[in-house]
From Swiss-Prot:
Encoding gene, per UniProt annotation: atpG
HAMAP family: ATP_synth_gamma_bact
Keyword Thylakoid: no
Protein name: ATP synthase gamma chain
Lineage summary: Bacteria, Bacillati, Bacillota, Bacilli, Lactobacillales
Function summary: Produces ATP from ADP in the presence of a proton gradient across the membrane. The gamma chain is believed to be important in regulating ATPase activity and the flow of protons through the CF(0) complex.
Length: 291
């Protein structure tokens, strides 16, 4: 019985230590989430402005017939997917949701292997390579608050692959942050830029201004920046969802640890009570034997 009590006590102490670790990790993820949410809000100001300007230029009569390759839809022979995952685990179902979605798309639409994968995140890279799937480019070790400089190269490589007709359309697959408890898998088309002409230009656009050298040249410079901003925005969004998933996972782990501790404590008290009862019984029996 003494051995059983010591084993239960050891389990309680071990679980309490685990609970402290997961609680600390939850607090760290929570702090990262707050920073990421603020970064996403700040970036949205820039993203909405560049979208407004780009839309307005595209709707003007001088550029509506632009032959910029980023605007031209062509027969789709191959599709590119930028897949954003985390670099580590402990984020609940964050990675499994997006990877399952990507694999379902590949199974349904790309049985002939007519796709290219650009992976951001070690989990995704390892997942695809373990299945013998080619990863054209990858980025590992993404910072908790990624700067544009850190992701500039892989974004530029993705855009160049489309422009050079290595693939004919480009999508970003990631977890969209809804709130601290919820994220949604999002598969968003980035290229060709097919939705802008249909958008309504903002009330205060640029069509009323004289632009130099000309609208075509400005648009040619602006479109890559616009596409890069869309992809970078998706990366920030995905990072925010990752931190939220990490916070939720660690909160769940902490709650589960507390439940285990409660169950073990009850088990310990019952075992201790049984041991005391047995000792009393033995003492009484011994006393009776001496009479």
């Amino acid at each position: 019985m003494a051995g059983s009590l010591s084993e239960i006590k050891a389990k309680i102490i071990s679980t309490e230590k685990t609970s402290k670790i997961t609680s600390a990790m939850r607090m760290v993820s929570s702090a990262k989430l707050v920073k990421s949410e603020q970064a996403a809000r700040d970036f949205q100001i820039y993203a909405s402005k560049i979208r407004q300007i780009t839309t307005d230029l595209l709707k003007s009569e001088l550029t509506i017939g632009s032959d910029n390759p980023m605007l031209v839809s062509r027969p789709v022979k191959k599709t590119g997917y930028i897949v954003i995952t985390s670099d580590k685990g402990l984020v609940g179902g964050y990675n499994s949701k997006i990877l399952k979605s990507v694999m379902d798309m590949i199974t349904e639409y790309h049985a002939d292997g007519d796709y290219e994968i650009i992976s951001i995140g070690s989990v995704g890279s390892d997942f695809f390579k373990a299945r013998g799937m080619n990863v054209a480019f990858e980025l590992r070790g993404l910072a908790d608050q990624p700067s544009f400089e850190q992701v500039r190269q892989i974004i530029s490589q993705s855009v160049d692959m489309f422009v050079n007709e290595i693939f004919d359309e480009l999508y970003v697959c990631y977890n969209h942050h809804v709130n601290s408890l919820t994220s949604q898998v999002r598969v968003q088309q980035m290229l060709p830029i097919s939705d802008l002409v249909a958008d309504e230009a903002a009330e205060e656009g640029v069509t009323g201004f004289e632009l130099e050298p000309n609208r075509h040249d400005i648009l040619d410079q602006l479109l890559p920046q616009f596409t890069e901003s869309l992809i970078y925005g998706a990366i920030i969004d995905a990072k925010t969802a990752e931190h939220a998933a990490g916070m939720t996972a660690m909160q769940t782990a902490t709650d589960n640890a507390k439940n285990v501790i409660n169950d073990l404590t009850i088990q310990y008290n019952r075992a201790r009570q049984a041991a005391i009862t047995q000792e009393i019984t033995e003492i009484v029996a011994g006393a009776n034997a001496l009479e």
